[in-house]
Amino acid sequence: GWNDATFSGDYRYFLNCWSDANHPYVYTIMDRKGKVVREVLNNDKLTQDLAQFEPTKKEFFTFTTSEGVSLNGWMIKPANFDPTKKYPVIMHQYSGPGSQQVTDSWSIGSMGNGGLFDYYLTQKGYIIVSVDGRGTGGRGAEFEKCTYLNIGDLESKDQVEAAIWLGKQDY
C-alpha cells in the first residue's frame, strides 16, 4: 500500500491517506502513536460503485533484463483472462528522471496509470502494462541517477526489454 501523512502544527495528530493499487483512498486522523482517532473518508461507496464494472486486480511483477537489471512493473489483464490465449498489450511509461509509475497506490484518472480508461481497454481484451525503467524513482540514488547526461538511452532499452519479456509469456 501507500501512505501519505499531513501533520498538525504540534505533531500530535496527522491526517493519513492510505490506498493500494486495488483500493481507493481512505483518510483517517491518527495520533502520534498511529492510533486511529477518527475515520474521515473510507470511499466504501466508490468501491461499491466501481464493483459493477468488475475491474480486474492490478498485478505486480519483476523481471531481469539481458543486462542483469531487475525492473518492476504492473499489468492489468482482461476480466476473462485465459493464460493459454495470446492478448494484445498496450505499454505506457513516462520514465522521466525520478518519476515512478509502478506504485502500489490508487490511480483512477489518467491513462497509463491504471486509471479507468485502462480498465476499459482490458474489457476490450487488452493487457495494460507499465514498467519502471532505469532512471525512475523509488529505487535509490544509483538507479535513479544512472541516466544522468544520457537521457533516453537506458530508459528506451529497458522498455524494449520489457516488451521482449512480455512477448515470451504464454499469454
Language-model segment annotations:
Residues 2-171:
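Serine-hydrolase catalytic core recognition
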